[in-house]
Swiss-Prot record:
Keyword Ligase among record annotations: yes
Binding site for ATP: G401, E402, P403, D425, T426, M427, W428, Q429, T430, D516, R531, R542
Organism field: Zygosaccharomyces bailii
Protein name: Acetyl-coenzyme A synthetase 2
GO biological processes: acetyl-CoA biosynthetic process from acetate
Pfam families referenced in this protein's UniProt entry, alphabetically: ACAS_N, AMP-binding, AMP-binding_C
Length: 675
């Protein structure tokens, strides 16, 4: 591989842009919302040059208002007072449920794919309206009112969606806590948000295993007088679930007492719709605050224009409502547009690796949205299942959560999409609310490995991290920032606006700082590098850890890799690579030592001597969040001999791997340094 000058986005060299396959157009229920690149550019230009009129028109078109807004946009990033749709009033639940229930009562709203397929069910918009109203009635009878916070600790079942919409119906604020979090993590989030009510279930089911959900809630809330009521849904119906008299109430008993329709409460555009906690590098998790109108519009617009979603379509987002992906693209995005959403409780491997494809075949899903982590798993061990099912209904394949490598992109396109689908690699984050960089399906040609172009209103730019100056033109690399506000961006951190300003608005005054490194290629397409702290500067060479990781995973025996930079007295930083092998080897032996040397030489040969890892550490597994992201900051701390300063680990799914990683670093890195 030829090494390009470091400022050039070399991944884009000799990469041809792909236009939408013929199948995409033939299978559409209606014309594309954006027909071609020319129309995208015209709309994008208006969205950044005249956002007031552009988004004002879209807000009136896509949302129903109780009171019209008087001005579309106010405030600035500099002042941290971003405001959209001033003086307008609306209700999120009405926009997601009522208006569709009145127009198409029997249309599917939620398609539930349970852990055990025999438990599958479907909920129409009219039934969803009844369920949401009844749960809202229960909450209202308990004194929940506009502006109150309510915690939701439920697995990925329809009742999680019902609970969120019931809270929004009252103008209250939902704070969903992923049902895989520990009792301590739940406690921290409930207390920080000030939730007096928690909605949960008796037990959960995932991958054929039972999760003792209510037991976790009881443990987390032990001694917490703040919580006065807990509503418990019977997911499994198991006997012996402990219920505290005067605090715990069964969902089915309480909802039976309520009316089937409860009028929605009008909310101001800027009233908080929800909190969602995201883990910081250190300290306590941040409760990111999203507003009602701006967030809803962002969810609606990106779902419509990025995915080219029509009301007749079926969207399968394989993400949990405990994360922003589930909020925006399993709930609010599809439902505000009146599109059916598949709610998936299980895993891609249960009861076998054909599960995803059976779901798509059974419901004729048109859109599939999933994380690269799941795709890598299927590519490694489940690819043979794909041809067994008719998944020709698919039109758009989405990727979310991390940059997708060009190799995995092409596999997704060929093996899952059969070269008939558009691939939408989407870059966004909890704080953005909806897509920041993503192709508009059918209009924007795509490139394997590139998230492509900014969404409407996202005035994206590349900043030199050293000088803080915006880099003009194409073929530039730096950090990704946004020059002005967009409707769905987070407004604050719960009860800590200073933290919000310090984290996102202060690093580069006048810009929103995404925290991601990126390159803008010769065509103006964006290539996401990952977190800025995942960029390593070795002897003046800025190295993308993703590029080094790609080189490592090109080796036939490498399963996964993660690269971090640590301080180095000679070179400023040095590259440390953590690698898990397909054969599971991690202990020292002559073969393992040879493998470590071989991997160093591979990077040296493919990228250059300056990119060669100082050390390759073989581990059995890498630390990951519950959404599948590798926690590189944990690896960096361990490699920096700071294993006693790992910070917040509440989002880690496999904390049991940490001791073995520490041992591997001691054996393969620190011990060798002493020799």
């Amino acid at each position: 591989m030829t090494v390009k000058e470091h400022k050039v986005v070399h991944e884009a060299q000799n990469v041809e842009a792909l236009h939408a396959p013929e199948h995409f157009y033939k299978s559409q229920p209606g014309p594309s919302y954006i027909k071609d690149m020319k129309q995208y550019k015209e709309m994008y230009k208006q969205s950044v040059e005249d956002p007031e009129n552009f988004f004002g028109e879209k807000a009136r078109e896509l949302l129903d208002w109780d009171r019209p807004f008087t001005r579309s946009k106010y405030g600035s990033l500099e002042n941290g007072d971003v405001t959209w749709f001033l003086n307008g009033e609306l209700n999120a639940a009405y926009n997601c449920v009522d208006r569709h229930a009145f127009a198409n009562p029997d249309k599917p709203a939620l398609i539930y794919e349970a852990d055990e397929e025999a438990d599958n069910r479907m909920i129409t918009f009219s039934e969803l309206l009844r369920q949401v109203s009844r749960v809202a009635g229960v909450l209202q009878s308990w004194g929940v009112k506009k502006g109150d916070t309510v915690a939701v600790y439920l697995p990925m079942i329809p009742e999680a969606v019902v609970a969120m919409l019931a809270i929004a119906r009252l103008g209250a604020i939902h704070s969903v806590v992923f049902a895989g979090f520990s009792a301590g993590s739940l406690k921290d989030r409930v207390v920080d948000a000030g939730c007096k009510v928690v909605i949960t279930c008796d037990e959960g089911k995932r991958g054929g295993k039972t999760v003792h959900t209510k037991k976790i809630v009881d443990e987390g809330l032990n001694g917490i007088s703040l919580v006065s009521h807990i509503l418990v849904f019977q997911r499994t119906g198991s006997e012996g679930i402990p219920m505290t008299a005067g605090r715990d109430y069964w969902w089915h008993e309480e909802t039976a007492k309520q009316r089937s329709y409860l009028p929605p409460v009008p909310c101001n555009s800027e009233d908080p719709l929800f909190l969602l906690y995201t883990s910081g590098s250190t300290g306590s998790p941040k409760g990111v605050v999203h507003s009602t109108a701006g967030y809803l519009l962002g969810a609606a617009m990106t779902t419509r224009y990025v995915f080219d979603i029509h009301p007749e379509d079926v969207l399968f987002t394989a993400g949990d409502v405990g994360w922003i992906t589930g909020h925006t693209y399993a709930l609010y995005g599809p439902l505000v547009l009146g599109t059916a959403s598949i709610i998936f409780e299980s895993t891609p491997a249960y009861p076998d690796y054909g599960r995803y494809w059976r779901i798509i075949q059974r419901h004729k899903a048109t859109h599939f949205y999933v994380a690269p982590t799941a795709l890598r798993l299927i590519k490694r061990v489940g690819e043979a299942e794909i041809p067994k099912y008719d998944i020709s209904s698919l039109r758009v394949l989405g990727s979310v959560g991390e940059p997708i490598s060009p190799e995995l992109w092409e596999w997704y396109y060929e093996k899952v999409g059969n070269k008939n689908c558009v691939i939408c690699d989407t870059m966004w984050q909890t704080e953005s609310g909806s897509h920041l960089i993503a192709p508009q399906a059918g209009a924007v040609p795509t490139k394997p490995g590139s998230a492509t172009v900014p969404f409407f209103g996202v005035d994206a730019c590349i900043i030199d991290p050293v000088t803080g100056i915006e880099l003009q033109g194409n073929d530039v690399e730096g950090v990704l920032a946004v020059k002005s506000s967009w409707p769905s961006m987070a407004r604050s951190v719960w009860q800590n606006h200073h933290r919000y300003v310090d984290t996102y608005l202060k690093p580069y005054p006048g810009y929103y700082f995404t925290g991601d490194g990126a390159g803008r290629d010769h065509d103006g397409y964006y290539w996401i590098r990952g977190r800025v702290d995942d960029v390593v500067n070795v002897s003046g060479h800025r190295l993308s850890t993703a590029e080094i990781e790609a080189s490592l995973t090109n080796h036939d025996n490498v399963s996964e890799s993660a690269v971090v930079g640590i301080a180095d007295e000679l070179t400023g930083q040095s590259v440390i690579a953590f690698v898990s092998l397909k054969d599971g080897s991690s202990r020292e032996s002559s073969a393992v030592v040879a493998m470590r040397r071989e991997l160093v030489l591979q990077v040296r040969g493919e990228i250059g001597p300056f990119a060669a890892p100082k050390c390759v550490i073989l581990v059995k597994d890498l630390p990951k969040t519950r959404s599948g992201k590798i926690m590189r900051r944990v690896l960096r701390k361990v490699a920096s001999n700071e294993a006693d300063q790992l910070g917040d680990l509440s989002t880690m799914a496999n904390s049991e791997v940490v001791p073995s990683i520490i041992a591997a670093v001691d054996e393969q890195f620190f011990a060798e340094k002493k020799k």
